[in-house]
Every structure is written in C-alpha cells, then in structure tokens.
Amino acid sequence: SGAESIAQDKELTKELLHAAGVSVPMGHVVDNPDDAWRVAQSLGKSVVVKPKDGNQGKGVAVNIHLEEQVRMAFSVAQQYGSKVIVERYMPGQDFRLLVVGDALVAAARRDPPQVIGDGVHSIKDLVDQINLDPLRGDGHATALTKIRLDEIALATLVKQNLTIDSIPIQGARVVLRNNANLSTGGSATDVTEDVHPDLAASAVTAAKMVGLDICGVDVVCEDIYRPFEDQGGGVVEVNAAPGLRMH
C-alpha cells in the first residue's frame, strides 16, 4: 500500500513527522567520507551513521564522534545501501509503541542481544562479560537468557563482516541477532502503563502522518514516562505492524 511504501522511505517519513512537530533525529544523506564528517561536525556531539535503505541494524554505527570513526563507519554503511545517512545520535533506550487508530495500545522496551565495542576486547570477550550477569541463565527461570554465540549469531556477525575474534571500535554496536526475542538473549519489558500522554500523542501523530491504521512506532528516549521536550529523544522509525499488515 501507499502508506507502507512511505514507511519504508525513512527520510520521507522523517520529513513528514518533522513537519507535523514530532521529534525526530535530524540528519542528511551523504555521498562520501568527507561529506559524512562535515555533516557530523554540523550536527555536533555524537552521530549515527547508517545505510539509507538498510534494515535490521546492518552496517549501523551508533554514538560515534571522532573523524576516523565517522570515516570508517561510512565505508561500512556503504556496503549495505547505495546512500548513507548521518544523523544526530539520540541517547536512550529503544521502545516499540503499538498504535491502533487513535490509540496507543501497548508499549515495550526492547533490547536485542548486542555488545558495544570498547576498542580493546573481542566480541567473544564482550559477550562473556554480559553473560556473567546473574540475571542471565540458560532457561526460562531467569529474567534474561544468556546470549548464545550459535550459528545464527555467527551468521549475523558475518553479515557485519565480523567474527567472534573481531575487536569492535569504541562505541560500535554489534548486534548478535536481528530481533529482540527473549529466548535468544534479547529482552523486552512491558511499559504500557508508563508512557507519558504527550509521548503517546506523538506516536499517534506519527502513525497518522504515515497513514497506517495499525503500526509500530519505534522511539528512542531515556525515559518513556517523560515527554520528548524534557529529555531529547524522538521517533526513529514507523513500521507497518508485524503480523498485523492490512492487505
């Protein structure tokens, strides 16, 4: 449908939302590493570098601010999409808000199994550190499942041109699975009751602007119980809700 194709064009979505007064991470499409660094400097602070038509976090670098990091991230992102976007980094947590019509019906905080590089440790070491968390176990009895370096994780790494022995640069986010399923080391927490009314209204506006009756609005912010104005953050993506597409 038209609405779904709008939702797939991330830049168009962002422009529509910005025009409607919804907070979004501003950014620009860049053609080369020099361009990427120039835009990064103009945005100030930290940036995200990602392929324009990428999905599922492939070729994405978050929270980087040094010139060499930005240039390296550009060359990685370029392998996954024709164009590369540099945008303002929004610190915070990932939330998925489910909007049906005029109402926010559910919200969850989502954390896929991932490690953040420190420029020193290998991916295997970083995973081992995370798995030491007493909340993580091997079954369903614990709050979180240990992150598994299984075939899917290895394949996910290969897609990012990495192995378990790779040492990711400082701040590079390495996703070990492309989803936040609890059973595979991701985590999701129901926060429906906590969403601030202004933030819920922003999500509904976002869905309306894109023209989807049922959609998942992905939000990044520090706290879901405060409006965007108080903390920065904003809507990073609008998706036709998985499993609920209207054909």
Model-predicted regions and their roles:
Residues 2-148, 197-201:
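Active-site nucleotide/adenylate-binding loops and adjacent lid/helix of ATP-dependent enzymes
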Residues 26-33, 154-163, 213-219:
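Short, mixed-charge, low-aromatic patches
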Residues 103, 111-118, 122, 159, ...:
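ATP-dependent carboxylate activation and anion-phosphoryl transfer catalytic cores
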Residues 126-187:
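Extended, charge-rich helix/loop segments that form flexible
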